[in-house]
C-alpha cells in the first residue's frame, strides 16, 4: 500500500510523497524491476521511473492511472463551483510547494521518456481517470506501451477483474 493508505502509516499522500516512497523502496530493497500501480500510484510510478535508471527489462503495469492531474483539478473546481481566482491561487500553491506547475504531474508527459515495457489497463467508463486523458497517449503509438482497454469495469472493478489479472500475469511471464 501507499503511504497513508490501507495498513500503511502516515496521514498524508500526494504524488511526490508516493514517488519518493517508490525511490526509497527501490534504493533500500531493490532493485525493483516490476511494478503494478493503480490510480495515483500510476502517476507516482511514472514520476519515479522518470528519475530512475531503468531499461526495457523493467515492466510497469498502470491500472487506471491518474493520467492528467489537471483533469482531476478541473473536476474538483467544477464540482465545488469555485471561480478562476481560487483556481489560480491553487495552481500557484502547487507550484510553490512542489516546484512544478500542475500540468507537470502527468503520466502522458512522462510516457515518451519511459524505457520500460508498460501494460496500461484502462476502462472506457472510468469516471475518476477518464479515457479521454489516455487517448492522446494511445494515438502516439509508443512501441513500449501496450494498452488493454476494457468497458464497464470503471475505476475500481478493473483491478479485480479476472481477465485483467490474467493479462497482467501474461505480461509478467518470462
Predicted regions: what they are:
Residues 124-129, 156:
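Acidic catalytic loop of the alpha/beta-hydrolase fold
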Residues 52-98:
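Hydrolase active-site cap/lid region
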Residues 113-115, 120-122, 126:
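Short beta-strand/loop motif that positions the catalytic acidic residue
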Residues 10-33:
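Alpha/beta-hydrolase active-site loop
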Residues 36-45:
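Gly/Ala-rich beta-loop-alpha elbow adjacent to hydrolase catalytic centers
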Residues 153-163:
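Catalytic histidine-centered segment of alpha/beta-hydrolase-like enzymes
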Residues 116, 130-139:
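Short alpha-helix in the alpha/beta-hydrolase fold that links the catalytic acid
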Residues 1-9:
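Conserved alpha/beta-hydrolase
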Amino acid at each position: 500500500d501507499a503511504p497513508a493508505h490501507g495498513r500503511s502509516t502516515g496521514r498524508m499522500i500526494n504524488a511526490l510523497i508516493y514517488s519518493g516512497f517508490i525511490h526509497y523502496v527501490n534504493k533500500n530493497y531493490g532493485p525493483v524491476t516490476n511494478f503494478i500501480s493503480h490510480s495515483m500510484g500510476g502517476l507516482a510510478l511514472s514520476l519515479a521511473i522518470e528519475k530512475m535508471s531503468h531499461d526495457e527489462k523493467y515492466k510497469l503495469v498502470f491500472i487506471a492511472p491518474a493520467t492528467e492531474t489537471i483533469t482531476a483539478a478541473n473536476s474538483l473546481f467544477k464540482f465545488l463551483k469555485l471561480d478562476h481566482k481560487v483556481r489560480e491561487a491553487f495552481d500557484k500553491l502547487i507550484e510553490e510547494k512542489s516546484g512544478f506547475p500542475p500540468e507537470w504531474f502527468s503520466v502522458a508527459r512522462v510516457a515518451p521518456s519511459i524505457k520500460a515495457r508498460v501494460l496500461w489497463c484502462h476502462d472506457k467508463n472510468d469516471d475518476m481517470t477518464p479515457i479521454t486523458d489516455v487517448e492522446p497517449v494511445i494515438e502516439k503509438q509508443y512501441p513500449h506501451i501496450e494498452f488493454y482497454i476494457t468497458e464497464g469495469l470503471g475505476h475500481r472493478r478493473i483491478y479485480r477483474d479476472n481477465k485483467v489479472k490474467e493479462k497482467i500475469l501474461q505480461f509478467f511471464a518470462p
